[in-house]
């Protein structure tokens, strides 16, 4: 699976951002979804390698909760671990090829892919970002997923939730050629919007939410009957 190198993306960013902001009538060019790492992300470690599941579920719940408490208040660490494990398995079995095909196609047209990515951020929706690196020995690509929630155009920087860091804001500097998470450096990037609201993925997250809800004593903060309704599912 190929992705756009950071150097190639950086030259599109400055050209696109000012035009998008003007076109949308946004006064402040900083795109901030108000996502908060210490509230809206998983509190568990990504040590088992569940990064995609963690960012996808955090995004879905953040956009769908409609007044419910934040993710860390709703789901216990044990429930978070079960959700992350089962959702990562679903992703690995059902969505890897879709993701690879999308990133390969849009590798040839980075400006349009990045434009849609920025439109999502400017509308207040965190966006899934895939990071890739192929080892010097030519082995299989190493993949990592983060969730972008704020765009700082004057610095050409994305603020992201990186599941390897449970309490810290992280930054992807698009002017650089790489991003390092723990001890792995990534040098290619993809914005897989095809996965943001994939119907099968959404259904799986709804199911896992209703199954592994956090309990305080006998009282549920939310339950299988009170499922979040995504904004795109609401009637006007």
Task: Give the label of every model feature segment.
Residues 13-24:
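Bacterial N-terminal signal peptides
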Residues 1-8:
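N-terminal secretory signal peptides that target proteins for export/translocation
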Residues 27-33:
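Boundary at the C-terminal end of the N-terminal hydrophobic targeting segment
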Residues 34-112:
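Cysteine-nucleophile protease catalytic domains, especially the papain-like/related folds used
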Residues 138-143, 152-236:
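Cys-His-centered catalytic/binding microenvironment captured across papain-like cysteine peptidases
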Residues 106-160:
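Active-site-adjacent substructure of cysteine-protease-like catalytic cores
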């Amino acid at each position: 699976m190929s992705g756009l190198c950071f150097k190639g993306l950086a030259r599109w960013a400055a050209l696109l951002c000012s035009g998008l902001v003007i076109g949308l009538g946004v006064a402040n060019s900083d795109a901030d979804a108000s996502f908060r790492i210490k509230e809206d992300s998983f509190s568990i470690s990504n040590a088992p390698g569940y990064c995609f599941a963690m960012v996808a579920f955090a995004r879905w719940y953040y956009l769908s909760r409609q007044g419910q408490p934040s993710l860390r208040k709703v789901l216990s660490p044990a429930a978070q671990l079960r959700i992350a494990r089962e959702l990562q398995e679903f992703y690995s079995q059902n969505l890897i090829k879709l993701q690879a095909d999308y990133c390969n196609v849009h590798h040839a047209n980075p400006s349009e892919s990045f434009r849609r990515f920025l439109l999502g951020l400017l509308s207040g929706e965190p966006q899934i970002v895939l990071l890739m690196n192929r080892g010097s020995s030519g082995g299989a690509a190493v993949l990592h997923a983060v969730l972008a929630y704020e765009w700082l155009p004057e610095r050409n920087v994305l603020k992201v939730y990186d599941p390897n860091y449970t309490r810290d804001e992280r930054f992807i500097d698009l002017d650089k050629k790489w991003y390092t998470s723990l001890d792995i450096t990534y040098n290619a990037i993809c914005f897989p919007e095809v996965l943001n609201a994939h119907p099968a993925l959404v259904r799986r997250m709804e199911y896992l939410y209703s199954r592994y809800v956090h309990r305080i004593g006998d009282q549920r903060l939310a339950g299988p009957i009170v499922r979040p309704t995504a904004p795109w599912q609401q009637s006007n």
